[in-house]
């Protein structure tokens, strides 16, 4: 099976270690979202630099380097602030990279929240549409506000991040009702991500996720659902292998459902064809002078 993980912060563990885990558990490709953590202002996420006016511009040098070195295994997305004063020019620069597959916006902070609710993300979404880039949107507790944008930009592919769940909800108490309501829009897709962290109270294989997975599948259909482990952030609840095999062994999903959600949807929506030749498993303990074998769980 051609498996694509549609978001990993691989810069946290390094490209070599990421590849070793991918090889070990059978993942062909990863969409990298470079992330280090929050800045002093927790609504701003690093790596980024501050622009005049206090807006942060995210960057992803390690993500792009991984994609350049291993184009069959990695591509990347870039976070973009809707408040960036040079938004149009910045998106044009980003879109020139052959390995950029999507933009992502994270609606944190009072200014971003107010702008999102008031239609202030039009310029960002217009730029994404102009360059043919899908738009990943993280907007916890504000998912219904995405609906007007989906109507206004019917030819832009939106992807709801992290199941649309509220980050601060007690574990296993977050709901996806607002998210599945947006399945009425044919240009809105869902990333099934962080589900063990936000939606489950049980240990692996997280059987309490199955009714919610079925709810999402019935609403969106398999052609508009993609899987994401977000491994480096969610590993307190599930190892990378557990996040994957929860899906591979799900009794709710048919074999065709799994093929779409675990790879084909991402390939289609991100315009990222599968490589002609699948990866070959590399040794788990490569011999590197003075180097130790990578460790992972």
How would you label these PLM feature ranges?
Residues 11-13, 37-40, 83-86, 108-111, ...:
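Active-site environment of divalent metal-dependent phosphoester hydrolases
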Residues 12-22, 84-95, 174-175:
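Short, acidic/polar
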Residues 19, 64-65, 92, 147, ...:
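Active-site phosphate/pyrophosphate- and oxyanion-stabilizing loops and adjacent acidic/basic residues
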Residues 114-226, 274-296:
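Catalytic pocket-lining loop regions of alpha/beta-barrel enzymes
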Residues 3-8, 30-32, 75-78, 101-105, ...:
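Hydrophobic faces of well-ordered beta-strands that scaffold small-molecule active sites
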Residues 42-57, 283, 287-288, 294-296:
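Intrinsically disordered, low-complexity Ser/Thr- and acidic-rich flexible linkers and loops
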Residues 1-8, 12-29, 33, 215, ...:
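Mid-to-C-terminal alpha-helical segments outside catalytic/metal-binding sites
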Residues 46-141, 148, 191, 195, ...:
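Active-site gating/metal-coordination segments in enzymes
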């Amino acid at each position: 099976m051609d498996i694509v993980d549609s978001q990993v912060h691989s810069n946290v563990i390094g490209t070599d270690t990421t590849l070793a885990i991918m090889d070990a558990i059978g993942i062909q490709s990863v969409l990298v979202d470079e992330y280090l953590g929050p800045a002093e202002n927790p609504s701003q996420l690093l790596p980024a630099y501050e622009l005049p006016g206090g807006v942060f511009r995210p960057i992803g040098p390690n993500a792009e380097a991984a994609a350049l070195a291993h184009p069959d295994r990695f591509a990347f997305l870039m976070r973009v602030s809707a408040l960036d004063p040079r938004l149009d020019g910045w998106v044009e620069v980003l879109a020139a990279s052959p390995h950029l597959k999507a933009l992502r916006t994270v609606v944190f902070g009072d200014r971003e929240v107010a702008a999102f609710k008031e239609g202030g993300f039009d310029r960002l979404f217009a730029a994404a549409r102009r360059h043919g880039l899908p738009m990943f949107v993280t907007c916890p507790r504000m998912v219904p506000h995405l609906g007007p944008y989906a109507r206004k930009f019917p030819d832009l592919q939106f992807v709801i991040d992290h199941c649309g769940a509220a980050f601060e909800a007690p574990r296993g108490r977050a709901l996806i009702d607002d998210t599945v309501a947006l399945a009425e829009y044919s240009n809105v897709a869902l990333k099934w991500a962080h589900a063990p962290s936000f939606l489950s109270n049980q240990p692996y294989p997280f059987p309490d996720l199955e009714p919610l997975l079925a709810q999402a599948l019935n609403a969106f259909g398999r052609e508009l659902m993609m899987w994401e482990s977000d491994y480096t952030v969610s590993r307190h609840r599930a190892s990378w292998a557990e996040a994957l095999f929860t899906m591979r062994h799900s009794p709710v999903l048919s074999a065709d459902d799994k093929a779409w959600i675990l790879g084909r949807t991402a390939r289609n929506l991100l315009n990222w064809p599968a490589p002609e030749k699948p990866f070959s498993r590399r040794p788990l303990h490569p011999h590197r002078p003075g180097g130790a074998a990578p460790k992972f769980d």
